[in-house]
Swiss-Prot record:
Binding site for ATP: H45, I46, M47, G48, S49, G50, K51, T52
Subcellular location: Virion
EC top class, as a word: hydrolase
Boundaries of every Helicase ATP-binding domain copy: 32-185
SUPFAM superfamilies membership: P-loop containing nucleoside triphosphate hydrolases
Predominant cellular place of this UniProt entry's protein: virion
Similarity comment: family membership: Belongs to the helicase family. VETF subfamily.
The EC number(s) this enzyme carries: 3.6.4.-
Protein name: Early transcription factor 70 kDa subunit
Gene: VETFS
Amino acid sequence: MNLGIVSLFREHVDSIPNILPHQLATLDFLLRSILDENNSVLLFHIMGSGKTIIALLFALIVSKFKKVYILVPNINILKIFTYNMGIAVNLINSDYVLENIHIYSTTSFYSLNYNDNVINYNGLAKYNNAIFIIDEAHNIFGNNTGELMTVIKNKNKVPFLLLSGSPITNTPITLSNIISIMSDEGINFSDIIIQGKKVFQILLNENGVSVLKRILRDKISYYELQDTELPSIVFHGRRFLDTRIVYCHMSKLQERDYINVRKLCNNEMFEKNMNNVSLAVLGPLNLINNLDILFQDQDKELYPNLKISNGVLYGDELVSLNISSKFKYFIARIQSLTGKHFIYFSNSTYGGLIIKYIMLSNGYSEHNGSQGTNPKTIGGRLKTFAIVTSKMKSSLEELLAVYNSPANNDGSRIMFLFSSNIMSESYTLKEVMHIWFMTIPDTFSQYNQILGRSIRKFSYTNIAEPVNVYLLAAIYADFDDDITSLDNYSIDEINVLPFDIKKLLYLKFKTKETKRIYSILKDISVNYTLPPHPQIVDVVLGELTRQFFYHHSRVRADDPELFAAIDRVLCSPDSTRRYLDEITRGHFFVCNRVFEKALLYRHGEDIIVVPFKLSHDQFLWAINFRKEYNVGAPL
């Protein structure tokens, strides 16, 4: 990034609509690398730092010269990008051609370019002289869309902007797709990878390090938020390597079923049944692979105090919780906690079902659903929960609007948000004070993505208050090991540890290698100091103007401080005077700390901010019958 741009801003005010200094500095780098040099770039910015806005601002700027195709993982994220495009348009102080920007979900882009599962090569010519922006780039490969991107790259010779907060999803092998899309050089990955027997033993060798540095040098933009921009994190439980976890000792009932299921698992690291029984046991249903089975039984006894009928669980066991050591801890702990909770779990088969009836049985009511037994309240309102799974994508936006609303900062509208992997990327959660892992994530990337939904810039009004994180592990009743080093156990010894402990150790092994590679990417990230790129000058000047008039309501037209701020970029007194004249004649939009939304006006020898308020005729509906006419019905 261009550190020269960052140096233009002192004590940048982030609380108003603005473009952050690091975003402007990154835009400068993208323009030089992609627009000028036709090189691909990996935008490796840690979650919550504003990659989406950077990508959209870049798309707007280059839309004057090229067509831009933006690919996102799914329709919900497409809606997020479309919404943020409106924000980017309002922020950018530059010309653009919106018709040249096309945003697709990967599935819709696939359907546009395939006929009967075969790439339509004749139709690829339309992508000549284009730029592709790939959101969550680490997840797009290994399928037909990834294959299509490789074909377009080789056939059309177009540059790619790859967005990722975690470019290694599992092992270093997953980085190979990103390298291949960013380079014309063929790579034999067996030459750069050390392949062990276990997945966490896949390492990048010394030759691989050299290849990585050579191919990706000058093609990486790395950024992570400063500690001062985020709340601190407090991990709860006992020490486990470099973090803490909560040991949840299983009851005899849970441990018996847990051991029986484990004996039947050939490769338990990939067995969803182990995720099931680590969360909770359901007797005869522990090994089911089809949720429909849960809705077929009539009054089936699972345990003496737990039955299921038509998909409804009932019985005292939902309160005594011998079926789940994790929920026994969770239910007991939350009674003394205040604020909102975000709870990650794997919905392997029956996760969502067991959560629903445990919460209802313990007095917590379902958002827009059933009321809990002896319902608990906060400020006269029911304490409620919501469960997000892949089956509720269509209503997720409405749910998050309630959860993130200022009225819900205390959790009085929705206190507990349970979510499976659907919430692991691109979504933002606000004012979450407690983050729970009911299931141990499979990868370091997934773990970071889940934390990154909540712990991100602008998600907290008070960053002085810490965020609490609970990693829950279901363990045997007699397990009490202190794990302080990855060298504590041999591979054979790891295999007989409780499933969650084994999974955590695997995660930490993979994390160690991932962090090593991330350090390499950080080291080859590009930083420089230059005047702003010509295509970004107006955007930089616009942000300098916004920052200045946040603090000032009225200044002389030749105010030395204002003049100096603008002239540092233009380096021409005449050009600076013309710019100041243009923004007053054009009534540039600013946010002032006194008057809030305002426009700039010239008043005699002064420049003043004039607050405004939009008003409009009230209509119940309007129909655009023709482009020239609108017909409306007044209220």
